[in-house]
């Protein structure tokens, strides 16, 4: 079991903890598939809803909040039945807008894993307005069920009445809907090819600034992030922040980063290079490789 879970595992009911420990191996990064979840539910003699709430301390253990020191864990349940953990991330000494909220982390985890719809969000603190707006961008977002400890479950529409969302800006394919943009780039670099694929899967209906970041660590592992825009603009999730959230979920340190690549469309209304460099230079002595590509 990873050291970061030693304290949080003691907060779980013993039968659930015993069943969960084998999953918390060195490569565990917060994903539990539907079959594993069913086994946890059976072994613990709890309902699935009870298990998901009980797992929140494990999700919160993924957090990296050096500024607030407030650990928030979230779990996104996909339509597939799989669950995806996420946690808040703050960059030391950097502006607060670089922060990643736990709900964003969990949703991006699900998106990067191929989920096309989120049906439930479980979180240990009431979603802030920023996160409510972020969730409203999702496929059938208004009907996502929000679960909080010791509170009744409600749909997102309950938490965000009279919402402004993608439909108000004539966007018919919301975040997580299957869509892809093709780009032209001649490269044999596996890291750049990976970034190009993720840029094509990014979500930028408001600026057309499709983009992705790939981070490579000293052992050759790569961690990707995609741009995820929002109808309200400010709650948009930048690809560097998504990549850093991905990296920390995998229990890697910022000091492990040896290479960073940003790929973005030449036809976008904005560029993410400045914000991406700001975040990168805060946490790693690595120069950003910036590649601009043309859509097909």
UniProtKB/Swiss-Prot annotation:
GO terms for molecular function: cytidine deaminase activity; identical protein binding; zinc ion binding. The keyword Cell division does not apply. Zn(2+) binds at residues 101, 128, 131. InterPro entries: APOBEC/CMP_deaminase_Zn-bd, CMP_dCMP_dom, Cyd/dCyd_deaminase_Zn-bd, Cyt/Deoxycyt_deaminase, Cytidine_deaminase-like, Cytidine_deaminase_bacteria. GO terms for biological process: cytidine deamination. Residues 47-167, 186-296 form the CMP/dCMP-type deaminase domain. The active site is at 103 (proton donor). Substrate binds at residues 88-90. Keywords: Hydrolase, Metal-binding, Zinc. Its EC number is 3.5.4.5. CDD domains: cytidine_deaminase (cd01283). It comes from the Bacteria. GO terms for cellular component: cytosol. Its cofactor is Zn(2+). The keyword Hydrolase applies. Binds 1 zinc ion. HAMAP family: Cyt_deam. NCBIfam families: PRK09027.1 (NF006537). Homodimer. This enzyme scavenges exogenous and endogenous cytidine and 2'-deoxycytidine for UMP synthesis. Belongs to the cytidine and deoxycytidylate deaminase family. This is Cytidine deaminase. It comes from Shewanella sp. (strain W3-18-1).
